[in-house]
């Protein structure tokens, strides 16, 4: 800040402090001995409020252990956090990284339909379920 701007800033700060203290004292009983402390507290609060906010460095995005494109293979799905290969990621994410599938997708900017299970494993489970009759209506017994 230049000296002119700094001087104007200090004058404005003093005026605001005086207005706030005057308004407070007009509605509250303040002993004379506490008045300098009140003025100093109000001035300090205003000075801190007008100080520029600290600049926060942008957060760098984490780098995945493997590329997102290579993480989904037919027989396995690779964890972007640690690089481990799994048939199903959901339990691994919760136990080792404390992440839900939604948190994992959000952290790595993955689409909502990003699989948590290897495609071949999902197909095998689906085929097995159909073979044992899951998903079909039960047949009624004749009475």
From Swiss-Prot:
One of its GO terms (molecular function) is zinc ion binding. The keyword DNA damage does not apply. Keywords: Activator, DNA-binding, Metal-binding, Plasmid, Repressor, Transcription, Transcription regulation, Zinc, Zinc-finger. InterPro entries: ROS/MUCR_sf, ROS_MUCR. One of its GO terms (biological process) is regulation of DNA-templated transcription. A zinc finger (C2H3-type) spans 79-97. Disulfide bonds: none annotated. The keyword Isomerase does not apply. Pfam families: ROS_MUCR. It comes from the Bacteria. Belongs to the ros/MucR family. Could be involved in the regulation of exopolysaccharide synthesis. This is Transcriptional regulatory protein MucR homolog. It comes from Sinorhizobium fredii (strain NBRC 101917 / NGR234).
């Amino acid at each position: 800040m230049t000296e002119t701007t700094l001087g104007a800033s200090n004058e404005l700060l003093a005026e605001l402090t005086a207005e706030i203290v005057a308004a407070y004292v007009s509605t509250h009983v303040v002993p004379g001995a506490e008045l300098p402390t009140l003025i100093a507290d109000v001035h300090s609060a205003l000075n801190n409020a007008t100080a520029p906010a600290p600049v926060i460095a942008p957060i760098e995005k984490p780098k995945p252990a493997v590329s997102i494109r290579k993480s989904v293979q037919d027989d396995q799905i690779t964890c972007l956090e640690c690089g481990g290969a799994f048939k199903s990621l959901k339990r691994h994410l919760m136990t080792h990284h404390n992440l839900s599938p939604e948190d994992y997708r959000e952290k790595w900017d993955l689409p909502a339909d990003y699989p948590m299970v290897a495609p071949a494993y999902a197909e095998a489970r689906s085929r097995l379920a159909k073979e044992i009759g899951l998903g079909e209506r039960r047949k009624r017994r004749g009475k």
